[in-house]
Amino acid sequence: PDNTIFKGDVWSFTTEPVAYPIQNVVATSNGISEGLSGPERTVDGSGLNAADQHSDIANDMWLAMAPEGEALYIQYEFDGVYKLHELLVWNYNVQFEMILGFGLKDVTVEYSENGADWTALGDVEFVRATGKDTYVHNTVVDLQGVPARFVRLTVNSGWGMMAQYGLSEVRFTYIPVQAREPQPADGTTEVEPDTVLSWRAGREAVEHQVYLGTDPDALTLAGTSDAPSFDPGSVNLGTTYYWRIDEVNEMQAVTTWAGPVWSFATQDYIVVDDFESYNDDVDAGTTIFDTWID
């Protein structure tokens, strides 16, 4: 060797984010809105560009009056219980917002797992919007990792003296503490009966509880694992199975996070590889009648 140094390529990788945005959020309100200014405008991305700058167009935002004798609120529902991280807020942002003051100011934040029992997170002041079409979110609410499927914002005051209040957009983020990315993927068919189940572990999980069965409403504990994989043993052919992973960490405030129910269907029969190589050659030891018997 002549000790020549061959410089390698430079590679890179990106670590996963601290938190992920919650998708498919449903927004409702007890407020009275007109035209296209309903609460859904705060979660549908209307008015946001690729740089997360919000427009100053009124129809891209929510604006409402409180019902008589009631405090105005806007409520958000997710598709399950999440460990909430932050709430990003784009306040009401029409061109003359600095004069009108329709944006929310003092807000009470509450959360719930079932939509019936509510816990107050606290009172927060939302920063006023700029009234420009380059406006980016300027309020971040720490949601403290609470478990919730619902979040409600109750309006205590706005930035002006008007009887209407509004928001442009909100975004909730969550910590991925539940199991995800199952293998076999959810709904997979023709799965071999000796398949080992695997998944991407929840971020805080110490133990994984594996529930498995043929009835999605009556899954039983099949076993536990300290790794994100589980061998269920030989399952039956031609059967649809349902499974769920509960992520467990006794040191956390919420000790168990139940995952979604996934499914897979096993193949109807086993395919024998190289079956055509069997014949009636006794001397070669490849006789089919000595190897395969119905």
Regions found by a protein language model. Give the residues of each.
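Conserved aromatic anchor
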Residues: T195-A205
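Extracellular carbohydrate-recognition regions
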Residues: E16-G35, Q267-D294
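Aromatic, loop-rich ligand-recognition surfaces of beta-strand-rich domains
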Residues: K7, E16-Y20, D52-G122, Y135-Q178
